[in-house]
Amino acid sequence: MTVVIDKEESMAGTASETADSRGKLVAGAADMIRRRGLNATSVRELAKYARAPLGSTYHYFPGGKTQLATEAVTFAGDLAATLLARELDRGPIEGLRAFLQMWRKVVVDTGFRAGCPVLAVAVEDLPEAEGAPREAAAAAFGRWTELLTDSMCAHGAERAEAERMATLIVAAVEGSVAMCRAQQSAEPLDRIAAQLEPLVRSTITRDRT
């Protein structure tokens, strides 16, 4: 019996497999960066970590480590933004709680061995010619801040005040994630959670009184 394979289906399958393999490498890079930092992450080590041939890794990322790191940071930033946006649909308090819980789960579930890959790249001393990962980190922070700002504005906050509050949230969360790793404890995140929620409530109700 002769099986005829439709050319478009075959190409679609190959494209899907390629995208899947590439996506795994990007996710693997994000995981390595959040554990080791950018300077300690090489394309060769990533290939071993992801159990991928070194040649295919360079094929997917001809720009080398800089391209891979940039895409990994974008991937991590988008992942967090997607969760945050979904929960913010229920309101700024719910979004804040989910954002905090997401990072708490990251540090606790990894035994405090992993943090935020966006922060890890943001604090690296990168050559000016290799600044794309840092730019991706800035974009991720900006997107999270904008999502929080828009949600608070939609619930009654004045925009300038909402922007300040959103910046405080992102800065506090990122800093406390680093503290959690250093102290091997989730207490820093728990402490800021207790402080941030009433501040957000005050921000969204201030203009209603």
Give the ranges of each region predicted by the language model:
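Hydrophobic alpha-helical bundle segments that form small-molecule/ligand-binding pockets
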Residues: 128-130, 141-166, 202-209
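Hydrophobic alpha-helical connector segments
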Residues: 83-115, 165-169
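Amphipathic C-terminal alpha-helical segment
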Residues: 106, 124, 170-187, 201-206
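Short secondary-structure transition hinges
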Residues: 78, 101-149
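N-terminal intrinsically disordered/low-complexity leader segments
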Residues: 1-20, 206-209
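Short, basic, alpha-helical segments at the C-terminal edge of helix-turn-helix-like DNA-binding modules
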Residues: 73-79
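Helix-turn-helix
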Residues: 24, 28, 32-71
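Hydrophobic alpha-helical segments that form the core
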Residues: 119-120, 159-179, 191, 195-199
